[in-house]
């Protein structure tokens, strides 16, 4: 009877512990209500705990019926029944702790630690219960020790499952790395990129047009001033330079001569431009003067008269010679007449020819040829 009461008290203690675990699970569910996934997993854990408690109660009922039947049996069979009942109760406890710890590991790291502490309390309570049952009989103590040795093997699997929260920290680290933004500038374009998107910023067309519209040159007023200075100073300067070039290089130098009649004759010398051009072509350049009208021509010999007028002048001069001849024949001196009618060789000459030689002025060209209005 003592063992029966001990078993009942042990079962009541297990019920109390299961209730406490459910209350703790509900408390942790309320604390993690911000996370929807944690709430759902916590609710599933609560439902599993309730199902495990119902299984535990049914096992207790079955164990009580087994105990009642064992009282009618012998002592050896009674110890055997107690051994099996204790092993089943320990197995149910280990199963309960396993299911609860596996559910709590998915909720959060804090709930996993609290659930692992609750599972440890279950193992302690089971250990104390088995120690009490070992005092009843030696065979039950050996069975309980064997069950205790089997309990850590079953509880070792929750320890491996509870180490899962250490891997749950990696999403936060990857989220931090994925949230980082990389900024780069390529060919004048700014590129912002992270794990999800890539944004490219290019200079706007309005900015380019505004920069092009801005001119860095002179203003309109200054430009007009510059144009006025160039036109007002540059154009007269160019005209002066052209005039100097014409006067000293292109214009031919001229010289005025006076002939025997007192007329002015103009002679021209080759200009510098012509000299340079002849030198370039390899021609001989002379500094002699050249006149438009030849020296001793009709204009100079006849006093600016043409050929017909010169003929009239010559006829008048011949008449003048005849008059002189008549006056010479009146003189009684024959020697003078003979002297006038003979030349240096003693030949008789015409007096008109002699008078023409005195009146007529002769002109010669550069080659020594005599120039006259008729043979020119």
UniProtKB/Swiss-Prot annotation:
Cellular localization per UniProt: Cell membrane
Extracellular side: 26-224
Subunit structure comment from the entry: Interacts with ZEO1.
Keywords: Cell membrane, Glycoprotein, Membrane, Phosphoprotein, Signal, Stress response, Transmembrane, Transmembrane helix
GO cellular component, one term: plasma membrane
Upper taxonomic lineage: Eukaryota, Fungi, Dikarya, Ascomycota, Saccharomycotina
Region Disordered, annotated ranges: 59-80, 126-176, 331-356
InterPro entries hit by this protein: Mid2_dom (IPR007567)
Compositional bias ranges of the Polar residues kind: 331-355
Described function: Cell wall stress sensor. Involved in activation of a response that includes both stress-related increased chitin synthesis and the MPK1 mitogen-activated protein kinase cell integrity pathway. High-copy activator of the SKN7 transcription factor. Required during induction of MPK1 tyrosine phosphorylation under a variety of stress conditions. Required for PKC pathway activation under low pH conditions. Required for cell integrity signaling during pheromone-induced morphogenesis. Activates ROM1 or ROM2 catalyzed guanine nucleotide exchange toward RHO1 in cell wall integrity signaling.
UniProt membrane topology term: Single-pass type I membrane protein
Biased composition (Low complexity): 126-175
Family annotation (Pfam families): Mid2
Listed transmembrane segments: 225-245
Residues with PTM Phosphoserine: 260, 327, 329, 355
Cleavable signal peptide: 1-25
GO biological process: fungal-type cell wall organization; IRE1-mediated unfolded protein response; pexophagy; positive regulation of cell integrity MAPK cascade; response to acidic pH; response to osmotic stress
Family: Belongs to the MID2 like cell wall stress sensor family.
Organism: Saccharomyces cerevisiae (strain ATCC 204508 / S288c) (Baker's yeast)
Stretches in topological domain Cytoplasmic: 246-376
Protein name as it appears in the record: Cell wall integrity sensor MID2
Glycosylation sites: 35, 211
């Amino acid at each position: 009877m003592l063992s029966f009461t001990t078993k009942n008290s042990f079962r009541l203690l297990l019920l109390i512990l299961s209730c406490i675990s459910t209350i703790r699970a509900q408390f942790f569910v309320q604390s993690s209500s911000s996370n929807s996934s944690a709430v759902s997993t916590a609710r599933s854990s609560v439902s599993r705990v309730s199902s495990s408690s119902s299984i535990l109660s049914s096992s207790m009922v079955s164990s009580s019926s087994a105990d009642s039947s064992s009282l009618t049996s012998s002592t050896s069979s009674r110890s055997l029944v107690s051994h099996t009942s204790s092993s089943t109760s320990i197995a149910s406890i280990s199963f309960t702790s396993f299911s609860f710890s596996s559910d709590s590991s998915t909720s959060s790291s804090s709930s996993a630690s609290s659930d692992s502490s609750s599972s440890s309390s279950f193992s302690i309570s089971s250990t104390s219960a088995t120690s009490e049952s070992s005092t009843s009989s030696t065979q039950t103590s050996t069975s309980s020790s064997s069950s205790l040795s089997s309990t850590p093997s079953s509880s070792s699997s929750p320890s491996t499952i509870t180490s899962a929260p250490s891997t749950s920290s990696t999403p936060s680290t990857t989220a931090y790395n994925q949230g980082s933004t990389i900024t780069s500038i390529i060919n004048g374009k700014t590129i912002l990129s992270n794990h999800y998107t890539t944004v490219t910023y290019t200079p706007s067309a309005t900015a380019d047009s505004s920069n092009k519209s801005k001119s860095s040159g002179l203003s309109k007023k200054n430009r007009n001033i510059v144009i006025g200075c160039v036109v007002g100073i540059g154009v007269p300067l160019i005209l002066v330079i052209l005039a100097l070039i014409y006067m000293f290089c292109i214009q031919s130098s001229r010289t005025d001569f006076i002939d025997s009649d007192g007329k002015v004759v103009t002679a021209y010398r080759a200009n510098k431009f012509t000299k340079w051009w002849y030198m370039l072509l390899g021609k001989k350049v002379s500094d002699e003067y050249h006149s438009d009208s030849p020296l001793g021509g009709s204009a100079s010999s006849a006093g600016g008269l043409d050929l017909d007028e010169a003929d009239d002048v010559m006829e008048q001069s011949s008449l003048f010679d005849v008059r002189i001849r008549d006056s010479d024949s009146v003189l009684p001196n024959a020697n003078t007449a003979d002297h006038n009618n003979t030349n240096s060789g003693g030949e008789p000459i015409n007096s008109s020819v002699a008078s023409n030689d005195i009146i007529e002025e002769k002109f010669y060209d550069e080659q020594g040829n005599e120039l006259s209005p008729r043979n020119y």
